[in-house]
């Protein structure tokens, strides 16, 4: 909605992908999205009195793979809902480049430089990579971030440590928020920084602070 207001004020439509990229790379929203997702799946996997019977009938490996598949489908559905909502509310048009409403907004309204709306898509992002690449990387990195948190929650729940699992995942999110907010080098230890594309780049120079490929390796190794 904020990005639509930005486009309306500038007088040109957004690219249809820009609202989703803005949501997926917002430091504030990337804090809330995993929290909402974890609340939605907080009871997963359900460990009831019949669980041991199901595991015995299906086999431990098949049961565990079923839980992983459920996590993947939950993540796919959650991101699809966010993506579709952004497409509908964004009222954008399709093109293969960033819109002028994003790239030239601060030049047209310098008095608003640095406010929340103008920082939804920072120059670290649109000056560095094509918009389609940004959208694809946002989807993949967010999915891997959610999957890692879900896996931690699932593993501890299977050990009957549900409270410890919730505490652990929210601690990981909180540490990511704190380190990202001050851009401490330690932020790369936590998954949040690795899921936000613009943190990987400098504002003007086409030179990465940390290659995005490193974040893919980070998630692949941990998962």
What are these regions (language model features)?
Residues 57, 159-160:
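Helix-loop interface residues and adjacent transmembrane-helix termini in multi-pass membrane transporters
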Residues 163-177:
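Central hydrophobic cores of alpha-helical transmembrane segments
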Residues 1-8, 177-182:
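Alpha-helical transmembrane segments of multi-pass membrane proteins
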Residues 4-41, 65-154, 158, 192-219:
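Secretory targeting signals
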Residues 40-56, 60:
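Transmembrane helix boundary and interhelical loop/hinge segments in multi-pass membrane proteins
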Residues 60, 162-163:
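Membrane-helix interface/capping residues of multi-pass secondary transporters
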Residues 175-202:
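Extended hydrophobic/aromatic segments used for targeting, binding, or gating
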């Amino acid at each position: 909605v904020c990005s639509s207001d930005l486009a309306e004020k500038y007088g040109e439509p957004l690219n249809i992908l820009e609202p989703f990229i803005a949501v997926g790379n917002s430091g504030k929203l990337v804090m809330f999205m995993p929290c909402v997702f974890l609340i939605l799946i907080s009871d997963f996997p359900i460990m009831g009195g019949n669980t041991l019977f199901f595991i015995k009938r299906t086999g431990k490996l098949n049961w565990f793979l079923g839980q992983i598949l459920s996590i993947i489908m939950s993540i796919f559905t959650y991101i699809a809902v966010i993506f579709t909502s952004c497409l509908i509310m964004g009222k954008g048009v399709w093109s293969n480049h960033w819109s002028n409403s994003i790239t030239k907004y601060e030049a047209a309204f310098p008095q608003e430089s640095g406010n929340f709306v103008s920082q939804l898509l920072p120059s670290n992002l649109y000056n560095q990579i094509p918009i389609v690449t940004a959208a694809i990387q946002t989807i993949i990195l967010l999915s891997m971030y959610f999957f890692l948190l879900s896996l931690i929650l699932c593993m501890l729940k299977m050990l009957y440590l549900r409270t410890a699992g919730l505490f652990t995942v929210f601690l990981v999110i909180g540490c990511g928020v704190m380190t990202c907010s001050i851009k401490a080098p330690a932020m790369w230890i936590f998954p949040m920084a690795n899921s936000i594309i613009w943190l990987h780049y400098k504002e003007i120079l086409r030179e990465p602070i940390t290659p995005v490929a490193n974040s893919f390796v980070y998630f692949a190794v941990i998962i």
